[in-house]
């Protein structure tokens, strides 16, 4: 349903993929707009050539199904994506440890829910990977560059929602781990082959964006 949108990671392998990515983005922002830009599986299939697909973050379709206890449905969607993208589909695994537990009951409950959700997702994706032979790749859900910017990001969230920083009911992230981690940090969280699969994906991406002779948009008279 359009009201239950989820996240998906798409990367361009080549110029065909780049053009298809632009088409998908344009469709999502126009015909697919429903509070947020969206696409459905049929449009994704139509413009899938030249694209690499990762299953998404905590809010991805497959992770959401796993958190809801619907592993069979999660497997079915993994099969669908694998049918569309073949060897260019990867199960995206993430770990964002809770480094500081809140003493505020409401916030701590959210942290506990997030931590348990991550555990369920990782176990579920590992099971699907082993069962279907779909490779996993480790990523980090990056929202700021360095760990010490987490407080600024928290303020940004409060300002964006028009609420006070100390408002317990406002939107917030459960940990300060949503930053750009080093290879060493990622290897402390995941098996080496899962981390280094990012290099395999990077080597697949060979987009060459040609410089336009006249980059100015054409305006109707």
List the predicted regions and their residue ranges:
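Phosphodiester-processing cores and adjacent nucleic acid-binding clamps
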Residues: 1-221
């Amino acid at each position: 349903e359009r009201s239950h949108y989820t996240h998906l990671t798409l990367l361009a392998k080549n110029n065909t993929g780049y053009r298809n990515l632009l088409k998908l983005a344009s469709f999502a922002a126009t015909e697919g707009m429903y509070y947020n830009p969206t696409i459905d599986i049929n449009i994704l299939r139509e413009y899938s050539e030249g694209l690499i697909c990762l299953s998404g973050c905590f809010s991805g379709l497959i992770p959401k199904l796993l958190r809801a206890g619907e592993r069979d449905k999660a497997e079915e969607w993994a099969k669908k994506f694998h049918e569309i993208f073949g060897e260019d589909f990867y199960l995206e695994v993430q770990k964002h440890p809770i480094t500081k537990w809140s003493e505020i009951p409401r916030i701590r409950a959210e942290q506990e829910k997030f931590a348990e959700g991550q555990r369920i997702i990782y176990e579920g994706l590992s099971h699907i990977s082993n069962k279907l032979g779909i490779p996993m790749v480790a990523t980090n859900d990056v929202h700021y560059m360095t760990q010490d910017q987490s407080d600024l990001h928290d303020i940004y969230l409060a300002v964006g929602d028009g609420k006070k920083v100390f408002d317990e009911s406002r939107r917030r992230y459960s940990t300060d781990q949503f930053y750009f981690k080093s290879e060493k940090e990622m290897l402390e969280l995941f098996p080496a082959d899962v981390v280094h699969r990012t290099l395999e994906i990077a080597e697949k991406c060979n987009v060459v964006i040609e410089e336009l002779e006249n980059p100015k948009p054409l305006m109707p008279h």
